[in-house]
């Protein structure tokens, strides 16, 4: 493949601008099932056009076509976000009203912006890597964590929240958006991991140091313990814990956790049942040398937390959130400090695991034993 294929995918994604404008005007004249059928046909045509772009020399990685289609939908989501803010008009108005009204929520608004910016950049990078026949395993795992976290919260939130009674046929468009990332995740994970050619002496010296002689790791361990407590606490709030401390925190710090849209509740439960086990596992990996799986799971978790905290912080402060559920003015500084710190911690841990991996590399003796 050549670099022109990656450029073609970029141009193809920008075709979402005229397509959404025409689609919006046609959708206003047809029923919901017709809208879903046309939307599915458009996505199929995007995949077909991506195939035509690389007809002479098709990519070895079939995920090229997945990223091409998802890149197109990312531009659609960016258009939705801009239309919700009143920057543009007439592109997705009817679809937002009749197709997926839950995208009009503060949380829906934030994930549209995340998908239209962060995910879009990741798709372009991964398409370019495939075109140049280079590995993209690191950014791929980060993307897997990010998109799966958004699906885990957004799809159930649409069903159990206040929009549960307004589920439209367009909801079925979420099925490929749910299944394809899982399939992509397995393919990315099975790609050859990066080989670290560190001398045995360097690895042995790094792994001989206990936790007290690794101050950065010690700081990470302390932060992981605090983050675990924070996750459990907010998870209990999501489960309607009647304790006075939970009530006061919800009333004066994060009233958004009680939003009837249900996204914050599901997000806190995802933290409780996804992040807490990860934190415990990461604590083990920072203490016991040779845990070669640490960089991979850390990347996936870092991607998930980046998406989740961006959406949660934004929705908590957003004007589309009812005033009674928004973060109080006097609590904003503490709210931002806690939530930004909670979102940054996994990024620091991922940086530590990827760029200084000596402690996590298995020695040749351990590999022989296995």
From Swiss-Prot:
It comes from the Eukaryota. The keyword Transmembrane helix applies. Keywords: Lysosome, Membrane, Repeat, Transmembrane, Transmembrane helix. InterPro entries: EXPERA (IPR033118), TM6SF1-like (IPR047195). It is a multi-pass membrane protein. Its main location: membrane. The keyword Transmembrane applies. One of its GO terms (cellular component) is lysosomal membrane. It holds the Pfam family EBP. Enhanced expression in spleen, testis and peripheral blood leukocytes. It is found in: Lysosome membrane. The chain crosses the membrane at residues 3-23, 34-54, 62-82, 110-130, 139-159, 166-186, 218-238, 268-288, 331-351. Residues 60-185, 216-350 form the EXPERA domain. May function as sterol isomerase. Belongs to the TM6SF family. This is Transmembrane 6 superfamily member 1. The gene is TM6SF1.
């Amino acid at each position: 493949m050549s670099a022109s294929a990656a450029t073609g995918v970029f141009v193809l994604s920008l075709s979402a601008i005229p397509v959404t404008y025409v689609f919006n005007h046609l959708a206003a004249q047809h029923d919901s099932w017709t809208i879903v059928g046309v939307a599915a046909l458009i996505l199929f045509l995007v995949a077909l056009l991506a195939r035509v772009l690389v007809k002479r020399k098709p990519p070895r990685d079939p995920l090229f076509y997945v990223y091409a289609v998802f890149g197109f939908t990312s531009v659609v989501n960016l258009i939705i976000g801009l239309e919700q803010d009143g920057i543009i008009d007439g592109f997705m108005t009817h679809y937002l009203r009749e197709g997926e009204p839950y995208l009009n929520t503060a949380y829906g608004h934030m994930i549209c912006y995340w998908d239209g910016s962060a995910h879009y950049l990741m798709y372009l990078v991964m398409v370019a890597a495939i075109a140049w026949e280079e590995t993209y395993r690191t950014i791929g795992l980060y993307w897997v964590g990010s998109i799966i976290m958004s699906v885990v919260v957004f799809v159930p939130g649409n069903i159990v929240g206040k929009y549960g009674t307004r589920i439209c046929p367009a909801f079925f468009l979420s099925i490929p958006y749910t299944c394809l990332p899982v399939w992509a995740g397995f393919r990315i994970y099975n790609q050859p991991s990066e080989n670290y050619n560190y001398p045995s002496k360097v690895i042995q010296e790094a792994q001989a140091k206990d936790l007290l002689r690794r101050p950065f790791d010690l700081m990470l361990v302390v932060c992981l313990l605090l983050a675990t407590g924070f996750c459990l606490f907010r998870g209990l709030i999501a489960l309607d814990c009647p304790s006075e401390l939970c009530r006061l925190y919800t009333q004066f710090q994060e009233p958004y956790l009680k939003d009837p849209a249900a996204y914050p509740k599901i997000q806190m439960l995802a933290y409780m049942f996804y992040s807490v086990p990860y934190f415990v596992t990461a604590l083990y990996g920072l203490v016991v040398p040779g845990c070669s799986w640490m960089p991979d799971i850390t990347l996936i978790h870092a991607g998930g937390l980046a998406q989740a905290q961006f959406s949660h912080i934004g929705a908590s402060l957003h004007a589309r959130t009812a005033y009674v559920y928004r973060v109080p003015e006097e609590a904003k500084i503490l709210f931002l400090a806690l939530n930004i710190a909670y979102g940054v911690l996994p990024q620091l841990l991922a940086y530590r695991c990827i760029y200084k991996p000596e402690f996590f590399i298995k020695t040749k003796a351990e590999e022989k034993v296995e």
